[in-house]
């Protein structure tokens, strides 16, 4: 079954446009609080644990988490939660192993980027390698988030894919470039509130109510395999968890969050907070996918399950709210990728080799 396009009314579209305008205004507000490079790239190194936790949650709960997990829930069942569960485990491991040392070392060296740490510990050659891989990874990851956001807008509004892509990209690049990490933090707080409201507070109860009215339930009407945690295949699950957890130790945004904390304990506690929050989103996204299998069993693509549920069963007004909840997950991942990629390009390439006096 194809997903209906353009089924949103004026109210839904207005909610989306107000959301985009709000992100731009937050970027402008944050730009007025900039006093130097530290403020721009690492928020003045003074953020509390809740802000750090929000940055972690926002950065890791992106399009691949919400859309991918719900898609796996639709196709495979509860085993689809493994990817986001691995993110939560990664947060815990990183919190106890790396968060405090990174904050302490960055305070001594006064560094801003991950490659700067590499340069101080090893040499310039290794730092350049770290910079190039960081920039390439962030470009690819950011582009993927832009595409995910554009695809959702395209499905639900009927706007052309090109227009949706440009809109998502322009809004994100604008508020990041004007406000830096403070803008990312302010917008991420709003975006995570919207994500929880859209996916957990609104979408889950609406789907539950729809199933109850239809006289069906997950446990009675889904195949038994949908409740097998190993249905994805244990080799795949182990490989996925290992690669996800290890990626925390090589991703520059992990270091940025720790450097931005006001002290070492805050860096650790904030990361633990994120792990708890991530598990809530993992459960909600998997549930939406499994509920979608009963509500809309013949979708052409499991990747469209959240968009399809919004289009087909949600009332107008809530369509827009749930959509911006999902968009928030995508945009909050893209913004930190834009910031950290630009930080590495500026600090580790431009200032190091092209214009050292900048």
Q: Over which residues does each language-model region extend?
A:
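Small-residue-rich segments of transmembrane alpha-helices in multi-pass membrane proteins
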Residues: 47-56, 119-124, 128, 191-205, ...
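Membrane-water interface regions at transmembrane-helix termini and the short interhelical loops
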Residues: 72-76, 103-104, 148-156, 170-191, ...
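Membrane-interface helix-loop-helix modules in multi-pass membrane proteins
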Residues: 42-110, 236-247, 254-298, 309-329
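Membrane-interfacial loop-to-helix junctions in multi-pass transporters
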Residues: 10, 47-50, 121-129, 157-166, ...
